[in-house]
Amino acid sequence: MPELPEVETLKNSLESKLIGLVIKKVEFKRDNLRYKLSADLADQIVNTNIINVRRRAKYLIIDFNNNHSLIVHLGMSGRFTLQPNNYEVKKHDHVVFNLSNNEKLIFNDTRRFGMIYSFHTELLEKDFFANLALEPLSDSFELQYLKSKLMNKKVPIKNLLMDNRIVVGVGNIYASESLHLAKIHPDKFGKDLNDDEIKNLIAAVKNVLSKAIIAGGTTLKDFVNGDNKPGYFTQQLMVYARDGQECLSCSSSIIKTKHSGRSTFYCKSCQKA
Protein backbone atom coordinates (compact mmCIF):
# COMPACT_ATOMS: atom_id res chain seq x y z
CA MET A 1 0.00 0.00 0.00
CA PRO A 2 1.37 3.45 -0.88
CA GLU A 3 2.52 5.30 2.23
CA LEU A 4 3.38 8.93 2.93
CA PRO A 5 6.41 9.14 0.58
CA GLU A 6 4.49 7.66 -2.35
CA VAL A 7 1.55 10.03 -1.94
CA GLU A 8 3.90 12.99 -1.44
CA THR A 9 5.71 11.94 -4.62
CA LEU A 10 2.40 11.72 -6.47
CA LYS A 11 1.47 15.18 -5.20
CA ASN A 12 4.81 16.61 -6.29
CA SER A 13 4.44 15.15 -9.78
CA LEU A 14 0.92 16.52 -10.30
CA GLU A 15 0.94 19.86 -8.47
CA SER A 16 2.47 22.16 -11.07
CA LYS A 17 0.64 20.43 -13.93
CA LEU A 18 -2.86 20.55 -12.48
CA ILE A 19 -3.11 23.93 -10.76
CA GLY A 20 -5.04 26.34 -12.97
CA LEU A 21 -6.73 23.62 -15.02
CA VAL A 22 -10.44 22.84 -15.10
CA ILE A 23 -12.04 19.40 -15.02
CA LYS A 24 -14.38 19.46 -18.01
CA LYS A 25 -15.89 16.01 -17.66
CA VAL A 26 -15.75 12.98 -15.35
CA GLU A 27 -16.30 9.48 -16.75
CA PHE A 28 -17.03 6.60 -14.40
CA LYS A 29 -16.04 3.32 -16.01
CA ARG A 30 -16.81 1.60 -12.73
CA ASP A 31 -18.30 3.19 -9.64
CA ASN A 32 -17.82 0.41 -7.09
CA LEU A 33 -14.27 0.74 -5.82
CA ARG A 34 -13.69 0.04 -2.12
CA TYR A 35 -16.82 2.11 -1.59
CA LYS A 36 -19.40 3.18 -4.14
CA LEU A 37 -18.55 6.54 -5.71
CA SER A 38 -20.91 9.38 -4.88
CA ALA A 39 -23.49 10.03 -7.61
CA ASP A 40 -22.96 13.79 -7.34
CA LEU A 41 -19.15 13.73 -7.30
CA ALA A 42 -18.87 14.95 -10.89
CA ASP A 43 -21.39 17.76 -10.34
CA GLN A 44 -19.31 19.10 -7.46
CA ILE A 45 -16.05 19.47 -9.39
CA VAL A 46 -16.83 19.82 -13.12
CA ASN A 47 -16.12 23.27 -14.62
CA THR A 48 -14.28 24.50 -11.52
CA ASN A 49 -10.64 25.58 -11.31
CA ILE A 50 -8.01 23.49 -9.55
CA ILE A 51 -6.33 25.81 -7.05
CA ASN A 52 -4.19 23.43 -4.98
CA VAL A 53 -2.82 19.89 -4.85
CA ARG A 54 -1.71 18.65 -1.44
CA ARG A 55 -1.37 15.63 0.81
CA ARG A 56 -2.72 14.70 4.23
CA ALA A 57 -1.52 11.39 5.66
CA LYS A 58 -1.92 8.88 2.80
CA TYR A 59 -4.57 10.95 1.02
CA LEU A 60 -4.05 13.08 -2.09
CA ILE A 61 -6.22 16.21 -2.04
CA ILE A 62 -7.15 18.37 -5.03
CA ASP A 63 -8.78 21.67 -4.03
CA PHE A 64 -11.17 23.57 -6.32
CA ASN A 65 -12.24 27.20 -6.29
CA ASN A 66 -15.82 26.34 -5.28
CA ASN A 67 -14.80 25.15 -1.78
CA HIS A 68 -14.89 21.49 -2.75
CA SER A 69 -11.98 19.06 -2.63
CA LEU A 70 -11.36 15.73 -4.32
CA ILE A 71 -9.86 13.24 -1.86
CA VAL A 72 -8.06 10.23 -3.31
CA HIS A 73 -6.72 7.18 -1.47
CA LEU A 74 -4.73 4.78 -3.64
CA GLY A 75 -5.59 1.69 -1.59
CA MET A 76 -3.34 -1.28 -2.36
CA SER A 77 -2.74 -0.85 -6.08
CA GLY A 78 -4.15 2.50 -7.17
CA ARG A 79 -2.50 4.70 -9.77
CA PHE A 80 -3.38 8.31 -10.59
CA THR A 81 -1.63 9.35 -13.79
CA LEU A 82 -1.74 12.04 -16.46
CA GLN A 83 -2.26 10.74 -19.98
CA PRO A 84 -2.55 12.39 -23.43
CA ASN A 85 -5.92 13.04 -25.05
CA ASN A 86 -5.55 10.06 -27.41
CA TYR A 87 -4.97 7.64 -24.52
CA GLU A 88 -7.08 4.50 -24.82
CA VAL A 89 -8.81 3.56 -21.58
CA LYS A 90 -7.65 0.21 -20.18
CA LYS A 91 -9.39 -2.54 -18.23
CA HIS A 92 -8.69 -1.25 -14.72
CA ASP A 93 -9.07 2.47 -15.51
CA HIS A 94 -12.12 3.17 -13.36
CA VAL A 95 -12.39 6.98 -13.39
CA VAL A 96 -11.33 9.39 -16.15
CA PHE A 97 -11.05 13.13 -15.45
CA ASN A 98 -10.97 15.09 -18.72
CA LEU A 99 -8.92 18.27 -18.27
CA SER A 100 -9.13 21.67 -19.94
CA ASN A 101 -5.69 21.19 -21.54
CA ASN A 102 -7.03 18.06 -23.33
CA GLU A 103 -5.11 15.67 -21.10
CA LYS A 104 -6.75 12.97 -19.00
CA LEU A 105 -6.21 12.22 -15.33
CA ILE A 106 -6.76 8.48 -14.92
CA PHE A 107 -7.53 6.57 -11.74
CA ASN A 108 -6.48 2.96 -12.28
CA ASP A 109 -6.88 0.34 -9.56
CA THR A 110 -6.46 -3.37 -10.24
CA ARG A 111 -7.55 -4.55 -6.80
CA ARG A 112 -10.20 -1.83 -6.27
CA PHE A 113 -9.26 -0.95 -2.69
CA GLY A 114 -8.86 2.71 -3.64
CA MET A 115 -11.27 5.47 -2.65
CA ILE A 116 -12.37 8.77 -4.21
CA TYR A 117 -14.50 11.33 -2.39
CA SER A 118 -15.65 14.91 -2.80
CA PHE A 119 -15.91 17.00 0.36
CA HIS A 120 -16.25 20.61 1.49
CA THR A 121 -12.69 21.94 1.73
CA GLU A 122 -13.21 23.92 4.93
CA LEU A 123 -14.62 20.86 6.72
CA LEU A 124 -11.86 18.41 5.83
CA GLU A 125 -9.77 18.67 9.00
CA LYS A 126 -12.79 18.98 11.28
CA ASP A 127 -14.79 16.10 9.82
CA PHE A 128 -13.11 13.92 7.18
CA PHE A 129 -9.67 13.90 8.83
CA ALA A 130 -10.94 14.31 12.40
CA ASN A 131 -9.33 11.08 13.65
CA LEU A 132 -5.93 11.60 12.05
CA ALA A 133 -2.91 12.50 14.16
CA LEU A 134 -0.14 14.91 13.19
CA GLU A 135 2.29 14.58 10.29
CA PRO A 136 5.63 12.85 11.03
CA LEU A 137 7.65 15.44 9.12
CA SER A 138 6.18 18.33 11.11
CA ASP A 139 8.05 20.04 13.95
CA SER A 140 5.26 18.95 16.30
CA PHE A 141 6.36 15.32 15.98
CA GLU A 142 8.90 15.55 18.79
CA LEU A 143 9.88 13.91 22.08
CA GLN A 144 7.16 15.16 24.41
CA TYR A 145 4.41 14.48 21.90
CA LEU A 146 5.43 10.90 21.11
CA LYS A 147 6.33 10.15 24.72
CA SER A 148 2.80 11.10 25.77
CA LYS A 149 1.32 8.84 23.09
CA LEU A 150 3.47 5.83 24.05
CA MET A 151 2.93 6.15 27.80
CA ASN A 152 1.31 3.04 29.31
CA LYS A 153 0.99 1.44 25.86
CA LYS A 154 1.63 -2.30 26.27
CA VAL A 155 1.63 -2.64 22.49
CA PRO A 156 4.57 -3.40 20.14
CA ILE A 157 6.17 -0.19 18.87
CA LYS A 158 5.78 -1.45 15.27
CA ASN A 159 2.00 -1.41 15.69
CA LEU A 160 2.03 2.00 17.36
CA LEU A 161 4.08 3.54 14.55
CA MET A 162 1.39 2.45 12.11
CA ASP A 163 -1.48 3.83 14.21
CA ASN A 164 -2.95 6.92 12.52
CA ARG A 165 -4.14 8.15 15.92
CA ILE A 166 -0.49 8.53 16.93
CA VAL A 167 1.22 9.57 13.71
CA VAL A 168 0.02 9.40 10.11
CA GLY A 169 1.50 8.04 6.91
CA VAL A 170 3.91 5.46 8.34
CA GLY A 171 2.97 2.07 6.95
CA ASN A 172 4.57 -1.33 6.85
CA ILE A 173 7.63 -0.46 4.79
CA TYR A 174 8.70 2.67 6.62
CA ALA A 175 7.89 1.35 10.10
CA SER A 176 10.31 -1.55 9.56
CA GLU A 177 12.94 0.72 8.02
CA SER A 178 12.66 3.37 10.75
CA LEU A 179 12.89 0.85 13.59
CA HIS A 180 15.99 -0.66 12.01
CA LEU A 181 17.66 2.73 11.68
CA ALA A 182 16.77 3.55 15.30
CA LYS A 183 18.00 0.10 16.43
CA ILE A 184 14.73 -0.69 18.21
CA HIS A 185 13.22 -4.18 18.23
CA PRO A 186 9.72 -4.13 16.67
CA ASP A 187 8.26 -6.18 19.56
CA LYS A 188 9.32 -3.70 22.24
CA PHE A 189 6.32 -2.17 23.98
CA GLY A 190 5.76 1.54 23.51
CA LYS A 191 5.72 2.10 27.28
CA ASP A 192 9.22 0.63 27.59
CA LEU A 193 11.00 3.09 25.27
CA ASN A 194 13.20 5.58 27.11
CA ASP A 195 13.68 9.20 26.06
CA ASP A 196 16.80 8.50 24.00
CA GLU A 197 15.08 5.69 22.12
CA ILE A 198 12.06 7.88 21.41
CA LYS A 199 14.28 10.69 20.14
CA ASN A 200 16.21 8.24 17.96
CA LEU A 201 12.97 6.83 16.59
CA ILE A 202 11.60 10.27 15.72
CA ALA A 203 14.85 11.14 13.95
CA ALA A 204 14.81 7.80 12.11
CA VAL A 205 11.21 8.24 10.92
CA LYS A 206 11.96 11.72 9.60
CA ASN A 207 15.20 10.54 7.98
CA VAL A 208 13.69 7.50 6.25
CA LEU A 209 10.60 9.33 5.01
CA SER A 210 12.64 12.27 3.71
CA LYS A 211 15.04 10.02 1.82
CA ALA A 212 12.15 8.02 0.38
CA ILE A 213 10.50 11.19 -0.92
CA ILE A 214 13.76 12.28 -2.56
CA ALA A 215 13.97 8.83 -4.22
CA GLY A 216 10.40 9.10 -5.51
CA GLY A 217 8.94 6.55 -3.10
CA THR A 218 9.14 2.77 -3.09
CA THR A 219 7.85 0.71 -6.00
CA LEU A 220 7.54 -2.95 -5.09
CA LYS A 221 4.87 -3.72 -7.68
CA ASP A 222 2.20 -1.14 -8.51
CA PHE A 223 3.21 2.37 -7.46
CA VAL A 224 4.02 5.02 -10.07
CA ASN A 225 3.87 8.81 -9.82
CA GLY A 226 1.63 11.07 -11.90
CA ASP A 227 4.06 10.80 -14.81
CA ASN A 228 3.86 6.99 -14.71
CA LYS A 229 7.39 6.68 -13.27
CA PRO A 230 8.33 4.24 -10.47
CA GLY A 231 10.01 5.12 -7.19
CA TYR A 232 13.59 4.12 -6.49
CA PHE A 233 13.78 3.91 -2.69
CA THR A 234 13.51 0.14 -3.20
CA GLN A 235 17.25 0.22 -3.83
CA GLN A 236 17.86 1.75 -0.39
CA LEU A 237 15.73 -0.62 1.70
CA MET A 238 17.76 -2.01 4.58
CA VAL A 239 15.39 -4.67 5.91
CA TYR A 240 11.99 -4.58 4.23
CA ALA A 241 11.35 -7.65 2.02
CA ARG A 242 14.96 -8.78 2.62
CA ASP A 243 14.21 -11.77 4.88
CA GLY A 244 16.97 -14.36 4.80
CA GLN A 245 19.46 -11.90 3.32
CA GLU A 246 22.40 -10.34 5.13
CA CYS A 247 21.82 -7.19 7.15
CA LEU A 248 23.56 -4.36 5.33
CA SER A 249 24.76 -2.98 8.67
CA CYS A 250 26.13 -6.06 10.43
CA SER A 251 25.82 -9.10 8.08
CA SER A 252 23.40 -10.98 10.36
CA SER A 253 20.35 -12.51 8.70
CA ILE A 254 17.20 -10.40 8.29
CA ILE A 255 14.19 -11.95 10.03
CA LYS A 256 10.56 -11.82 8.91
CA THR A 257 7.75 -11.93 11.46
CA LYS A 258 4.15 -10.71 11.76
CA HIS A 259 2.46 -7.88 13.65
CA SER A 260 -1.33 -7.74 13.44
CA GLY A 261 -1.15 -9.82 10.27
CA ARG A 262 1.37 -7.50 8.61
CA SER A 263 4.91 -8.55 7.69
CA THR A 264 7.72 -7.08 9.77
CA PHE A 265 11.41 -7.23 8.90
CA TYR A 266 14.26 -6.66 11.34
CA CYS A 267 17.81 -7.60 12.31
CA LYS A 268 18.13 -9.39 15.67
CA SER A 269 21.71 -8.15 16.06
CA CYS A 270 21.07 -4.47 15.31
CA GLN A 271 17.66 -4.46 17.00
CA LYS A 272 18.09 -6.40 20.22
CA ALA A 273 15.01 -7.40 22.21
Curated annotation (Swiss-Prot):
Cofactor(s) this protein cannot do without: Zn(2+)
GO biological process, one term: base-excision repair
Active site per database record: P2, E3, K58, R262
CDD domains: EcFpg-like_N
ZnF endpoints (FPG-type): 238-272
Entry annotated with the keyword rRNA-binding: no
Range of residues in the leader sequence: none
Entry's EC annotation: 3.2.2.23, 4.2.99.18
Manner of cofactor binding, per the entry note: Binds 1 zinc ion per subunit.
Record SMART domains: Fapy_DNA_glyco (SM00898), H2TH (SM01232)
Top-level lineage group: Bacteria
Binding positions for DNA per the UniProt entry: H92, R111, K153
GO MF terms, alphabetically ordered: 8-oxo-7,8-dihydroguanine DNA N-glycosylase activity; class I DNA-(apurinic or apyrimidinic site) endonuclease activity; damaged DNA binding; zinc ion binding
Catalytic activities: Hydrolysis of DNA containing ring-opened 7-methylguanine residues, releasing 2,6-diamino-4-hydroxy-5-(N-methyl)formamidopyrimidine; 2'-deoxyribonucleotide-(2'-deoxyribose 5'-phosphate)-2'-deoxyribonucleotide-DNA = a 3'-end 2'-deoxyribonucleotide-(2,3-dehydro-2,3-deoxyribose 5'-phosphate)-DNA + a 5'-end 5'-phospho-2'-deoxyribonucleoside-DNA + H(+)
PROSITE patterns in alphabetical order: FPG_CAT (PS51068), ZF_FPG_1 (PS01242), ZF_FPG_2 (PS51066)
UniProt cross-references to InterPro entries, sorted A to Z: DNA_glyclase/AP_lyase_DNA-bd, DNA_glyclase_Znf_dom_DNA_BS, Formamido-pyr_DNA_Glyclase, FPG_cat, MutM-like_N-ter, Ribosomal_uS13-like_H2TH, Znf_DNA_glyclase/AP_lyase, Znf_FPG/IleRS
Keyword annotations of the record: DNA damage, DNA repair, DNA-binding, Glycosidase, Hydrolase, Lyase, Metal-binding, Multifunctional enzyme, Zinc, Zinc-finger
UniProt keyword Lyase, yes or no: yes
Short name of one Pfam family: H2TH
Self-association and partners: Monomer.
Protein function: Involved in base excision repair of DNA damaged by oxidation or by mutagenic agents. Acts as a DNA glycosylase that recognizes and removes damaged bases. Has a preference for oxidized purines, such as 7,8-dihydro-8-oxoguanine (8-oxoG). Has AP (apurinic/apyrimidinic) lyase activity and introduces nicks in the DNA strand. Cleaves the DNA backbone by beta-delta elimination to generate a single-strand break at the site of the removed base with both 3'- and 5'-phosphates.
Similarity-based family: Belongs to the FPG family.
Entry protein name: Formamidopyrimidine-DNA glycosylase
Name of the coding gene: mutM
